[in-house]
Amino acid sequence: MGFIKKMFDGNKKEVKSLRKVADQVQTFEEEMKSLSDEALQNKTKEYQVELQKIEDYKQQEAYLNKILPEAYAVVREASRRVLGMFPFPVQIMGGTAIHRGDIAEMRTGEGKTLTATMPVYLNALTGRGVHVVTVNEYLASVQAEEMSHLYNFLGLTVGVNLNSLTTEEKRAAYACDITYSTNNELGFDYLRDNMVTYKEERVMRPLNFAIIDEVDSILIDEARTPLIISGQAEKSTSMYIQANVFVKMLKDDIDYTYDEKTKGIQLTENGIDKAERMFKVDNLYDVKNVNLMHHINIALKAQRAMLKDIDYVVEDGEIVIVDQFTGRTMPGRRFSEGLHQAIEAKEAVEIQNESKTMASITFQNFFRMYNKLSGMTGTAKTEEEELLNIYNMAVTQIPTNKPVQRIDGADLIYASEKGKFHAVVDEVIRRHKEGQPVLLGTVAVETSEYISELLKKKGIRHNVLNAKNHEREAEIVQNAGQKGAVTIATNMAGRGTDIKLGEGVKELGGLAVIGTERHESRRIDDQLRGRAGRQGDPGYSRFYLSLQDELMVRFGSDRMSTMMTKLGMNDDQPIESKMVSRAVESAQKRVEGNNYDSRKRTLEYDDVLRKQREIIYAERNEILEKDDCSDQVKAMIEQSVRRAVDYHFTGDENEYDYEAFKNYAEDMYLTEGALSVDEISRRDNEEIYDIVMSKVMAQYQHQKEELQEQFHEFERMIMLRTIDMKWTDHIDTMDQLRTGIHLRSYGQINPLREYQNEGLTLFDTMLESIEDDVSKYILKSIIDRGEQVEREQVGKGEAMVANDGKEKVKQQPKVKSEPDIGRNEPCPCGSGKKYKNCHGRG
């Protein structure tokens, strides 16, 4: 309770501070009104001239804070002249909270788009770029189109970043002062920029300032969804089919247990026995059966926990994910870790090959890279603790311009779903007769279709908006506030379009919102309620629940069920009491708490990969920016040779195998016969290192002379290709480690610490592997001397060819996912023998 009290006290204080700023802005109103268009436009140039004199980011921020009241007044006046809209004081307050790097919580219909124009203009003056982030491309395009007139009038450029744009068009969009984009496209462009071969191919500038619309949807609801760029992995799909056939034979509570609350599934002893018999294995939990166990687990999850028309829909023979928070389908997105393939097997559609992750990032880590981050939404206060802890953004509830007139009825709870839906239909009929528009909110596609059937039987004309018919979304929402309209919508969250009341609807009580089930997130419920009573309009909302609703089943409806039985209440008699509302809210808080813990855990694990990603991307960028990477290459070669010497000549001198080292050095760095055993015998490590390095550097010089002025380009390409291939393999390895790490949570072992430690070891091994492979490629590649080598040739690896057969050449080096096994290394089969005496013979 202490945090909540502090939260609301803090909000009061913050609102007071914002009101002072709004008052200051209003003092410039008459002065701005008196300026000509040209004089008003010149204000932008004045600010920009001053900002160009300041290079330091913090000093620029201080200057922006200083000019804020006047600059906001400039935008207000320009908005009046260009758009015919004049921001209210509460919108100035919201805009100030956004500039401060916080979240402005503003109710539906309070004009968030206009509010954002002030901080967007102010921060765009620096020339560093401002990103306005929306949940879909339609909103990005519409907002950019509407607001570009204002920004262009003030001398600023506006770009829209869409998925369909070419590289050049994207670069132009990002070069603008203000760029509208979806969160997905920003994240993918960042990943793609860190996979380019030449710096000219990059499209983004350094991440400066982002304003996220529907910020809670993106930073909380989608926080755990990673953005993934993937390539095809060559894996058979037969295991998914076999696992699917097997789990269909299993019986609930006999062969496996399913926890409604956590959605966790576990095979029982009985189920394990069946699996061992079916797949003919002695011990299902043996390490060699990890892959089989994984397929059985995801097949179980697909069958039991993933529900058709709720978690996904089947469209044109494909599985399409349904966003649990918005009810929208997400074409192109796939469940990870083989779950998508398991669902494809379940639904008997074509199973697509698994993909291999080449680059990935979560929104949590992407948006934390901006210099300054802010947002706006209708509902975020309930998640302030998380937003503050993870993103360092406070949530300020901005007062409404006009008092809220909406009436929120208490929840009604019924014993069964049947009773609840009958009551909902009766309520719709009653209000529809009076001509009052009704919006019915459902949690799942299935429910919306069921209610639609009930209304059809009663002869009530209505529209359905769900994941299956999202094409008509704008049209349906536009008409939802008209007299007599009945609209059924799955999760109205993030729809981004206001429902405006038709003629004569105010007199009928405004829009009536009926929720048919509580969502596990209070924010989504609040967003549904918020569709009624916008901008001081009248409105009504009420939620109808049943003891069979998922939330009630998962969290303690037993007590209420017992109480209803004792009272002898039937299906048609609801309970309406504060106790019910408190119980529901308590259940929601528990779910939100569980989800927050899960997101926090995701972030803790993802932070391990984030630090590694930053190192790899920084290394890549350094290579891209340099014309000559020789110093980096030489450092890699030195490290590789040093490691090889220390590895082969450690411990008992009598055990030293000089022949093995000679073979290794010639295989990795030198031509055959370049090093003799006599040269290195009975010498210490430093002497051996110096001898080998002098020969290696001579070989390096030889390669340089062969390619002449193209050599530096050749080096860059080798480094980039090796880093990319090794990094891709490393992501895959880390993913497998993360999946399996929970199996170690026994005794005093902390899975996260284990993941951190092993992840670091794997990362170090990968870096060593990069050094070895870069050394081998650059020193051992055979170079075509016959013709001038073009930049594109080098890029494609065409500068490396086989020789004419006069010179004996070892096999071309390949980038492997594991380092080569030295002849004196322990054999990986676990026999304890050296590799040369075991599987390395012959």
From Swiss-Prot:
The cofactor named in the record is: Zn(2+)
Per the entry, the cofactor note is:
May bind 1 zinc ion per subunit.
Biased composition annotated in UniProt, kind: Basic residues: 833-842
Pfam families assigned to the protein according to its UniProt record, in alphabetical order: P-loop_SecA, SEC-C, SecA_DEAD, SecA_PP_bind, SecA_SW
Q: Which reaction(s) does the protein catalyse, per the Swiss-Prot or TrEMBL entry?
A: ATP + H2O + cellular proteinSide 1 = ADP + phosphate + cellular proteinSide 2
EC number annotated for this UniProt entry: 7.4.2.8
Entry's localization field: Cell membrane; Cytoplasm
Residues that coordinate or bind ATP: 91, 109-113, 498
Main localization is: membrane
Entry binding sites for Zn(2+): 827, 829, 838-839
Look up the record and give one Gene Ontology term from the biological process aspect: intracellular protein transmembrane transport
Gene Ontology terms: cellular component: cell envelope Sec protein transport complex; cytosol; plasma membrane
Q: Which keywords describe this protein according to UniProt?
A: ATP-binding, Cell membrane, Cytoplasm, Membrane, Metal-binding, Nucleotide-binding, Protein transport, Translocase, Translocation, Transport, Zinc
Record's compositionally biased regions (Basic and acidic residues): 804-823
Oligomer and partners: Monomer and homodimer. Part of the essential Sec protein translocation apparatus which comprises SecA, SecYEG and auxiliary proteins SecDF. Other proteins may also be involved.
Entries under PANTHER family matching the protein: CHLOROPLAST PROTEIN-TRANSPORTING ATPASE, SECA INNER MEMBRANE COMPONENT OF SEC PROTEIN SECRETION SYSTEM
**What's this chain's function?**
Part of the Sec protein translocase complex. Interacts with the SecYEG preprotein conducting channel. Has a central role in coupling the hydrolysis of ATP to the transfer of proteins into and across the cell membrane, serving as an ATP-driven molecular motor driving the stepwise translocation of polypeptide chains across the membrane.
The Swiss-Prot or TrEMBL record describes its family as follows: Belongs to the SecA family.
Its recorded name reads Protein translocase subunit SecA
Species for this entry? Macrococcus caseolyticus (strain JCSC5402)
**Its encoding gene is what?**
secA
